């Protein structure tokens, strides 16, 4: 199957601060099993034979990136981090364009603090979307019962979970289409929290590709502790 997978670029926006972690540094630089979350996220892609290259969006005043082992890796280019995720991703796409990437190239955007992406999920995403006219994302069907809250912290309704999915990353779209969608959102002051939202706003419907539920994003301290315990079991 590897020989049939499409070539792709990876983009990792890593300019956020992760305030909910209440840590002494941005969460992408917290340690897991001897290296940072960002390094683990990069590891998910750098050994893949279909990878064309990686762009990481880093804040201009980031003091941590220069000390990482990947900071001088020739496979990785750096883009300026923006105020919002969409700005950071758009800057990375501009770097790809400057490198000669084409509008028809596939781009996979992945969270810097999502270090547990399985190679099987990455290959599944590439395989299932290789000929898709829009692109799509890894996602997981909702498992728990979902409640809608009122303004007073009480349940106002139970949501039908049969149509609800949790959006994960990577999210895979053509470079040109993603660039146009993000640029249009920024010009129109439309706030999007992931790339699929921008594609949706442009009138297209991304495809959902079911992935593993342990491909979690580290958002709170207990997420990192869960990963530490899980990874300790690998030894």
Curated annotation (Swiss-Prot):
Keywords attached to this entry: Isoprene biosynthesis, Nucleotidyltransferase, Transferase
Enzyme class per UniProt: transferase
Reaction(s) this enzyme catalyzes, per UniProt: 2-C-methyl-D-erythritol 4-phosphate + CTP + H(+) = 4-CDP-2-C-methyl-D-erythritol + diphosphate
One BP term from GO: isopentenyl diphosphate biosynthetic process, methylerythritol 4-phosphate pathway
Domain of life: Bacteria
Annotated positions for site Transition state stabilizer: 20, 27
Pathway: Isoprenoid biosynthesis; isopentenyl diphosphate biosynthesis via DXP pathway; isopentenyl diphosphate from 1-deoxy-D-xylulose 5-phosphate: step 2/6
EC number per UniProt: 2.7.7.60
Site-annotated residues for Positions MEP for the nucleophilic attack: 161, 217
Stated family: Belongs to the IspD/TarI cytidylyltransferase family. IspD subfamily.
Function: Catalyzes the formation of 4-diphosphocytidyl-2-C-methyl-D-erythritol from CTP and 2-C-methyl-D-erythritol 4-phosphate (MEP).
UniProt-recorded name of the protein: 2-C-methyl-D-erythritol 4-phosphate cytidylyltransferase
Organism: Pseudomonas putida (strain GB-1)
């Amino acid at each position: 199957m590897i020989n049939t997978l499409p070539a792709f670029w990876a983009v990792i926006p890593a300019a956020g601060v992760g305030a909910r972690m209440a840590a002494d540094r941005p969460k992408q630089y917290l340690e897991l099993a001897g290296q940072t979350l960002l390094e683990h996220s990069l590891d998910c892609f750098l050994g893949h034979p279909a990878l064309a290259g990686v762009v990481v969006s880093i804040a201009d005043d980031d003091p941590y990136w220069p000390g990482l082992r990947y900071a001088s890796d020739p496979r990785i280019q750096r883009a300026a981090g923006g105020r919002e995720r969409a700005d950071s991703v758009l800057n990375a796409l501009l770097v790809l364009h400057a490198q000669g990437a084409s509008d028809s190239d596939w781009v996979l955007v992945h969270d810097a603090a999502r270090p547990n992406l399985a190679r099987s999920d990455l290959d599944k995403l590439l395989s299932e979307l290789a000929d898709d006219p829009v692109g799509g994302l890894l996602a997981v069907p909702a498992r728990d019962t979902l409640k809608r809250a009122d303004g007073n912290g009480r349940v106002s309704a139970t949501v039908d979970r049969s149509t609800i999915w949790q959006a994960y990353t990577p999210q895979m779209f053509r470079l040109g289409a993603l660039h146009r969608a993000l640029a249009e959102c920024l010009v129109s002051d439309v706030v999007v929290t992931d790339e699929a939202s921008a594609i949706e706003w442009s009138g297209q419907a991304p495809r959902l590709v079911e992935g593993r539920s342990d491909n979690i994003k580290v958002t709170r301290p207990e997420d990192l502790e869960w990963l530490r315990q899980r990874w300790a079991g690998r030894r």
